[in-house]
Regions:
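Binuclear metal-dependent hydrolase catalytic cores centered on His/Asp/Glu-rich metal-binding motifs
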Residues: 119-134
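Core catalytic region of metal-dependent phosphoesterases/phosphodiesterases
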Residues: 21-116
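Extreme N-terminal starter segment of soluble prokaryotic enzymes
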Residues: 1-6
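Short polar catalytic/cofactor-binding loops
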Residues: 9-14
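Short hydrophobic segments within beta-strands
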Residues: 8, 54, 84, 126-128
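N-terminal donor/sugar-recognition subdomains of glycan-related enzymes
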Residues: 15-19
Length: 134
């Protein structure tokens, strides 16, 4: 039996797009807010078994609205989701990964290497968030 994994990274949600002005900035920000829903839709369309998000999902400072949008989309994926925070959204006390409530199907790796067994998929997922070398 094969395993279908959806992998993505570097969304940089809530990026200020500081090098753009006016309409281009607005367009990019609106397009960026559609990414979580597009991930959910792609997960369903492709019948994925799990999702791996490998860092910099947020650009840095984030809005709670965006975090809620992401949490809802990830929950609606209906499969295990694994997040390894990156250098822009590192795992720490002020990060969205610690401050916000995430659905039960979402596992967020901290700065230490760890793993999660998924017996129903006959696999083990290893991960670590940014800061693992600290």
């Amino acid at each position: 039996m094969g395993l279908k994994i959806l992998h993505s990274a570097d969304w940089h949600l809530d990026s200020p797009f500081a090098s753009f002005d006016g309409e281009p900035r607005s367009f990019l920000q609106q397009a960026q807010r559609r990414i979580p829903e597009r991930l959910r839709a792609l997960c369903a369309e492709e019948h994925c078994d799990l999702v791996l998000l490998a860092g910099d999902i947020f650009d840095g400072p984030y809005s709670r609205e965006t975090a809620a949008l992401l949490a809802n989309a990830l929950e609606d994926c209906g499969v295990p989701v694994f997040i390894s925070p990156g250098n822009h959204d590192f795992y720490g006390p002020e990060s969205p990964w610690v401050r916000e409530n995430w659905p039960a199907n979402v596992h967020i790796f901290s700065g230490r290497l760890s793993y999660v067994d998924l017996p129903e998929l006959d696999c083990r997922i290893y991960g670590a968030g940014y800061g693992a070398m600290d």
